Regions:
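Short catalytic/metal-binding and nucleic-acid-binding patches
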Residues: 1-173, 178-183, 196-227
Length: 227
């Protein structure tokens, strides 16, 4: 995949997975650590925090002195990979942020699990969101990733209401924040997308429509799935 040029205020779909498709999140603490890093390392003034110990709580007061490298518009963490929707705010902001995020989490994970070596499958992948099809469907695609954990595609035994309930129970994404249920509100910047999707209730309707017409929408973004 050709690497895009990162430019100011442009939106990108960023993703990566564990080396050899290994799990990169083994327990609740791992998910919380990565999300904690999404917040604390999104700062021009902060270097990578490699400490094993950290607070699970995100201090809202810290945001007052932050100089954001990127806006985190949406995210989903899966057992062996992650998806981020980022808008660059500082020169070279995405590269700086992803370097700090990857290094910081890898060192935490290796220290915790007494392992050595790379954790991720090479450099992060990036796709520029530069057309309407991507722009309208990528946020929901990112948020619906957890449904693959229940093997929902092609299944006739699980209806769309059950799938939505599953998404509401899955904490490790920004989906809940977009439907009006606070989960990790300090991490994301949601006003832009909520304006595009005309509010929380309408985004919920869009999500339900996505689930009902999964194969149709997947065809529109089949060039950005993990390979």
């Amino acid at each position: 995949m050709k690497k895009p040029q990162f430019t100011q205020d442009q939106i990108y779909h960023i993703y990566n997975r564990g080396v050899e498709k290994r799990k990169i999140f083994l327990d609740k603490q791992d998910y919380l650590r990565f999300i904690h890093n999404l917040f604390t390392l999104n700062n021009e003034n902060i270097i990578t925090n490699n400490s094993y110990d950290f607070s699970n709580k995100l201090n809202k007061n810290e945001s007052k002195s932050r100089k954001l490298l990127v806006e985190i518009l949406a995210f989903t963490l899966m057992p062996n990979h992650f998806h981020l929707l980022l808008r660059q705010k500082e020169n070279n902001g995405i590269v700086k942020f992803m370097q700090k995020l990857g290094t910081g989490y890898s060192m935490y994970f290796n220290q915790k699990n007494k392992r050595v070596g790379g954790l991720f499958q090479g450099r992060f992948k990036a796709v520029i969101i530069d057309n309407d099809a991507h722009f309208w469907h990528i946020p929901t695609y990112i948020h619906l990733n957890p449904l693959s954990l229940i093997n929902y595609r092609g299944s006739t035994s699980i209806n769309y209401k059950q799938k939505i309930e599953f998404l509401k129970q899955y904490k490790w994404s920004s989906f809940l924040d977009y439907i009006g249920e606070k989960n990790f509100p300090s991490v994301i910047s949601k006003d832009f997308l909520l304006d595009v999707f005309q509010g929380e209730k309408n985004y919920m309707k869009i999500t339900a429509d996505w689930i009902k017409n999964d194969s149709k929408y997947l065809q529109k973004i089949n060039d950005i799935t993990l390979k």
